[in-house]
Amino acid sequence: MFIDRAKIYVKGGDGGNGIVAFRREKYVPDGGPSGGDGGKGGNVILEVDPGLKSLMDYKYNIHIKGKRGEHGQGSNQHGKSGQDKVIKVPPGTVVKEATSGKVLADLVHEHDSYIAAEGGRGGRGNTRFANPKNKAPRFSEDGKPGEEKWIVLELKVMAEVGLIGYPNVGKSTLLSQVTKASPKIDSYHFTTLNPNLGVVELEEGSRFVMADIPGLIEGAHQGRGLGDQFLRHIERTKMLIHVIDIASIEGRDPVLDIETINEELKGYNSRVMDKPQVIAANKMDLGDQAEENLQRLLDKVNSDEILIPEQYKKIFPISAATGEGLRELLDFVAEKVAQLPDTHDTFDIDLELPESEENTDTEQEALFTMSQDDKIEEKPKSDFGIRKEGDIFIVKHEKLEKILNEIDVHTEKGRHYFQAKVDEFGLEEALVDKGIKPGDTVKIGNVEFEYQ
């Protein structure tokens, strides 16, 4: 599952109260004030954890609060500050205001952090208010409430593998074959104007994000065609698959294409040439010309007649249309990607996600999320106690609460099981009857989630 959006409520801890207290001292009115200040409330802090890959945790745990500061004490003892609540997010998380959509933070690198909600200031004890006119004040100050708001977390996609090559060499077809993405494919130059992304998942558990980079032409590094905008996308990947039309369907020489594209990469930024790259000789299913061109390419590469980086000398004959050779290519790329360090560079665009037998989630749809648009089949009627407090619908249902106490909904199996029970008991139907709207919160036992 790849969840890339979550809406959460954050609240800094309230400040502790200052107190009224007096010490015992001869000739001093009431012994003199000695009320300590309250402690500051804890902040809610977002911090990048490179080990995280999704916003899964915040689909179920949407109310996050800092600890309250302790109250002051006598003898001018100040209350202890409340503990900060540090929540971990994956690299590439963008923080936005829920109402305006204003970007508050862009968390990319390890240990990047952002204070999402400030803790409240501690209240002042009566000692703070003593003055020549009032040497024994009998009042103090309460702590200030912590900052509170709804924020949206959005995870920008990190593409590990980029598909490069001339227009119409089959990059979009390759992406759609191996990731179940659905790029728009037409036979004219610059078909792909923005990178399309998809997730490649292999049986043994290997997984990486692949991006179809907009097509190149000669002179791109000087601004021709799509110019620098596609070259910047290339910089963000771990490695590249250079797709060529080995059958020369459009009359171009695939060997010359490789040299031309290399010159464009080198002209833009020589460091791009240091990225691991392999050649995918596509359209091998289209006749003898493909076989002849492949042999010519292999001969030139092996004899060093064609000046290409060493990493380009790994050539995979494939057909994106028929699937020929794709497994060998993907196995090699998956192994290489696992060995390479993360770039922490991101694509701020939508992600096409694959379907699997266990999970058919899409970009903003978690397994546990109930959608208004889903058709509800007839289910056994079940009695729910549902009451509304603000925008929170509190559900009382003995069996569902019992299930939540017995399973861990943070595991995939737990979520599958609980979602099945939610459907079985017809909870969504009952909530719709009560007037629930997208964005409202549903609470069952101690578990809260957002209705979408």
UniProtKB/Swiss-Prot annotation:
The keyword Transit peptide does not apply. The keyword GTP-binding applies. Keywords: Cytoplasm, GTP-binding, Hydrolase, Magnesium, Metal-binding, Nucleotide-binding. Mg(2+) binds at residues 172, 192. Its EC number is 3.6.5.-. One of its GO terms (molecular function) is GTP binding. GTP binds at residues 165-172, 190-194, 212-215, 282-285, 319-321. This is GTPase Obg. The lineage of its organism: Bacteria, Bacillati, Bacillota, Clostridia, Natranaerobiales.
